[in-house]
Structure formats: structure tokens, C-alpha cells
Amino acid sequence: RSLYVSLLTFMCFSACQGSEELEQSQEKEYTVSIMARIGKTVSGARYLQDHENAIASFSKTDDIGVFMDNDSAVRWIFDGTSWTTEKSVFWKDKNQEHTFYAYYPHSGSKAESKENIKMPSLDSQNGTWENIDQYDFLVASRKLSYDTDLGNVAFSGDYSFKHVLSLLKINIKGEGDMAQAVIDKIRLEGNGLTTQGYYSFETNSITISETPKETFQITPSHTMNNQDVSFYFILNGGENDGNIDPKAVKNHSVNLTIEYTRNNKYYITRRDDLSPGLLSGCIHKYNIVVKDGNVIITGGSISGWTPGNEEEDIVINGEEINPQTNNML
């Protein structure tokens, strides 16, 4: 009897051990792994940029949300080397293709489903580059099977993360009326520029479900001292079908108002249609001079925001003069 009990115990132990080894083997074999990049030319992984022309990449503690088919979104966190989850995600099979939908950031966004992802709020920006990543929103998607890359889902190359919103850069020259001025307020006006947006992977577009916010304002209180200064804004833009001509965009024009102080006098200068139309996924750059109370565009460009884009840049030519109404208070 003693021998029988010992044999039975050994068999149970062996079975349990075999089951654990099988589970570990399956876990190792069928676990989903993630690799994510921003743009085709990026070799790193955050949204980390010194300026708008630098390479963008992910940094430590950044997080993304990833849907597998119609499952709920899973949070993946970048540890500086790789992407990890609190709980492993497994492939449902080895041979069938599955679609992965990813968005950044997971924090600051809320995803009820892949058709209704609440994007970061845009109405608390201060116009500086340093915190611009808090307001950005990027997406990526890819359809593949386990056998495509031994379980790895690489959001890179043609499948890399892309910017969904528009980046507006306004560079104010430290000359003319602004040489020794203090910029008190900058106001942007347009259709739904900072209204809360919701992204859908089904339509690959943003929907606005709230009353459009027509005005956005910052109060930099910036002293020029003959130096140029740039302000950055992430805003809602019109759909981008590959044609980055802003004249093709409707209902996303931007009016600019600058309130400033010079020699103890308060001025307001305005430029209607600074941009005739903002495009999703594009950077709109405008260099301006305030001269004799007029906002004059001295140059700029419109280009794709995502690194490695194949869109041709549009150069904005400078103007001789732009008659506007200038008010002194």
C-alpha cells in the first residue's frame, strides 16, 4: 500500500509538473509582443522631440492602448527598452490573421471601444513646446497572424504611429512693432479648434460630439527684447486625403489676434484667415511680423507631421503688406 501511495503521488506530481511546463511553453509561444515607432524614419521607440523638426520617439513610462480585434483595449507601458503589460496577452491561434489597433496615449484618453476613443483635452495648452506631448494623439493599426513575425506586432514602417491632429506653429519676429513689446494675449478663432474629439478606427476619423469651441486664448505675458518667439498649438483639423493644400479644407480656417503692450500703450492687431484651413496630421508654420499695426506673413510652410511622410511640402510665400485694422486701447 505504501508503494502504491508513493507511485500515485509521483504520478500526480509528474502530471502537475507537465501541465505547468505545457502552460509555460504555450505562454512563451503564444504571447503577444509589441514594438512601436512614430513614423517610418524613426529608429527609437515616445513622443520625445526637442523641436518640431526633430525625430519623435517614445520614452520611458509612455503608454499606449492596443485593441486585438474587438477585444477591450490593453494598456502597454514602455520601460525604456520594450513594451510590457501587467498581464500577458495571448494570440487566439497561430494561423488566422487578427487586427491590432493602437493609440497613444492610453493615459489621458478613454476608450469605450475602438470606435469611440476619447482623445486628450486640448483646451489647457499654454503655447509652449515643452508640454506639447500632453495634447497629441497618435494611432496605428496592423493586420497579421502569429506566424507573420513569431507573435510580434511591430507598429513600424508603413504601420508606424501617425499624428491625427494638426500642429500650428506661429513664429513672431522680434522686430517692427514687436521689438520691445510684451505679448499679453494670443487668441485663435476657428470652427471647433479645441473641442473635445473622439477617434474611431472604423472610420479613421475624429468626431466632435460637443458644442464647438470657436475661441482659444493664452496669456503668455512674454517680453520680446528684439528676439523671435514661437508658439505651438495642437488643434483639430480637417480630413487629410493626401492633398495638403489648405485651400481644399473647409470649416477649419484660423483667425489670429495678438494683444500686446508697447511704450505703456495697449494694442490689438488681428489677422483673419492666418491659415485658410488646418489639415489633420500636418504641421502649419507661419512666420509673422507686426508692422504699423498689421500682421504680415513673411513666410512659412505646410508639411506632413509624421516623420518619413511622402507628402510634398507647401511653401508659404511672404507678403509685402497686409492691410488690417489696428486698435489701440
Regions found by a protein language model. Give the residues of each.
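Sec-dependent bacterial lipoprotein signal peptides
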Residues: R1-S14
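Sec-type signal peptide cleavage vicinity
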Residues: F13-L329
